[in-house]
Structure formats: C-alpha cells, structure tokens
C-alpha cells in the first residue's frame, strides 16, 4: 500500500532551505552561504514535519508510489521557510494613531510617555477591554501577520502592568496558542513600564512577590504556558539593578530571558543579558562596543527592530558591527501601537536599506536566527528534514523578490503553509 503524505511542493524554481547542517544559528560568514536548491521539491508528512527536500527529479522518483493530500505546482515560484517574528506586542486595545502626528512634529518617545501617552494610554484601554475583545483584535492581527508569511511569532503581555490585566493578556495569548495555526512564543512583560502610583522599586517588588508566583501557579495548573520574561531596561523605567532582579526571579521559575535593552540610552543591558544567560536582547540602538563583544561571547541573540528606529527616527542599530563581531543577529517587527507593522518582508527590506544588511543576512535573521532567539531553532527557521513544515511560496522566480519589493507583498505571497497545512491561499496573486 502506498504511503500517504500531507503535502508535496514540486518543481520550485528555488527552495531556500537556509541551513544544511542542522545549524542552530548563522553568523556573518554562514549567512553568505545559504542553502538554496534550484529546480527542487519538498515533501511534508502527515505529522506536519519535512520528510525530504531535494532535486525535483530525485523527489519524483523516490515518491513515485506515494499519495499526497495536497500538491502545489511551484513551477516558476520560490519556496522559503515561514518567517519568524522575534519581537511583538500584539495584545492591546486603543490604537495610538493620534500620536503619529506628534512624533512627526518632533515629540520623542519619552516626551509622549511622560505626557500620559504611549504605553500608559494603551494600558488604560487594555485594562478596560474584555478578554473577548482583546482576543478578537489579537486574532485579526495574527491573521495579517500570517498572510505576510509569518508562521512563528513572539507575543508579549505588558499593557496591563497590574497583575489582573497581565494575566488577562497571557490568557488571550494562550487561547491563540490553542486555537490558531500560527505558532506563538509567549512572553510575560509586566515590567514594560512603571504603573501609575508606584515607584520602580515598588513595581519590581510587586512583580517578584506577586506576579511571578501567580504565573508559576497558573503554569503548573496548565492554564497558561509562558516561555519568556521581558523587562524594559531604560532610564525612567527599570534601571539595571531592577532589571537584574526581575530577570533572575523569572529565570528561577524556568522562563527564558528575552528583554528590551540599550534602546534610548546606553544602559549596559547587553552586558547584563550576556552575564545572565539571556536568549536575546532586543533594540540595542545604544549598545556599546563592550556590549557587542559580550553578546557575541555569550551567544546571546541581538533582536534588531528596524521599524522602531525608522518610526522614532532613532539611530540605526549597529548591525554590521554586530555581525563582524560574531553576534547572532535576528529581526523582529516590534509590532505595537507605536510601530504598526505586520510584515516581516518589510522589516527585512528596512534592515537591508537602513541597517546595511545583505539580502541573505536579512533572510537568515528573520528565519533561523529569529527561531534561535526564541529557543525554537530545532523546529523552525529552515526547511531541513525533520523540521516543522512551515513554508512560504512566492510567485517569483527568484527568492530575493520577497525583500526587494517595497510593499505589495499581498500580491506576491501565494501560499502560506504551517505543518504541511495550507493556511493561506492567495487568490489575488499578480504576475511580476
């Protein structure tokens, strides 16, 4: 009896496997030599994992007696790994479109924050929103990310600050994890800002004494699954000492460290992340040479967010210096009310133009390296045999089009596949 498989992607012009030796991440040199197959096919099994990838003729012969639930003719098209968005804030109510004009007029992030806008504005609206309202808007945002090719996304809480609302946000993220196809890495970010009426020290004590024990108990009860802990380490928010205490307490209950650092001011956050064994530190616009060296030595990923630097007119993260120093560079959209971007193709484009990354470097940073930052490089980030069958099919004969195009990806991405299941089929694809 012939074996049955879930999906065959056949006759692709190019399949960008990314890695070929089970690498957990790629450094600068490895990024220049991405594994790319020409005239190739890929097979995904009924368990949702990749069974084979190789020359189209070879796959055709090896699977001549097999049957497939679905077959996609990829002639003239390219196949890439599903994109991994390593940093987002997608659960909230109350958009901040009105603040965009303020930014254009010269107001800084902290100007808006101190005036009661920014995070505080979103906290007020998120606190009053129902769990169902938050889930509905969150679901739609994840669907838009998926249509732009993202198949694994890191999702933070952090617009509650008080325990009850933080737990509400984490329950919303857990529901998405249970009900939706897109994969989620859940991050507790209760230290995103200092709540009104509290000092940073009081907020730190509250998080350690009350928030984290509640998270631990809910996790033990199977109510939520939280992967990471985040702190906004910044002047006027949580200083280095408070950040250290919160991260250490989170690590003690089994959370991975993945936090905001060196964004608006040099805080020695990168050095702290390296010291504590963090999986990743995000932003790093103001990182020092010493911090870059520390990240490289510790194999702590730098999650760079070109959207934030672009929108806030910050100095660009030093991607080239980091790559040359041996840092594992990853990318994220930083989707939030302040940086309203769902599209990893757009993030990669900005990384190339503004941060001087190459096309291959940007793709590796948005796939295997972003997966590494989330502790998922063993399942995501490349199209190697044994990994989860998460795939993006674009209607172009060269894979670079997904970064080269400045927008318009809704007419380029033809299929998005998760675990071998076609979760998005674009009926409006146009020829180049």
UniProtKB/Swiss-Prot annotation:
Binds 1 zinc or iron ion per subunit. This is Probable imidazolonepropionase. One of its GO terms (cellular component) is cytoplasm. N-formimidoyl-L-glutamate binds at residues 159, 336. Pathway: Amino-acid degradation; L-histidine degradation into L-glutamate; N-formimidoyl-L-glutamate from L-histidine: step 3/3. Its cofactor is Zn(2+); Fe(3+). It catalyses: 4-imidazolone-5-propanoate + H2O = N-formimidoyl-L-glutamate. Its EC number is 3.5.2.7. The keyword Metal-binding applies. One of its GO terms (biological process) is L-histidine catabolic process to glutamate and formamide. Zn(2+) binds at residues 260, 334. The lineage of its organism: Eukaryota, Metazoa, Chordata, Craniata, Vertebrata. 4-imidazolone-5-propanoate binds at residues 159, 192, 263. It comes from Xenopus tropicalis. Fe(3+) binds at residues 260, 334. Keywords: Histidine metabolism, Hydrolase, Iron, Metal-binding, Zinc. InterPro entries: Amidohydro-rel, HutI, Metal-dep_hydrolase_composite, Metal_Hydrolase. Belongs to the metallo-dependent hydrolases superfamily. HutI family. The keyword Methyltransferase does not apply. GO terms for molecular function: imidazolonepropionase activity; metal ion binding. SUPFAM superfamilies: Composite domain of metallo-dependent hydrolases, Metallo-dependent hydrolases. CDD domains: Imidazolone-5PH. PANTHER family: IMIDAZOLONEPROPIONASE (PTHR42752), IMIDAZOLONEPROPIONASE-RELATED (PTHR42752:SF1).
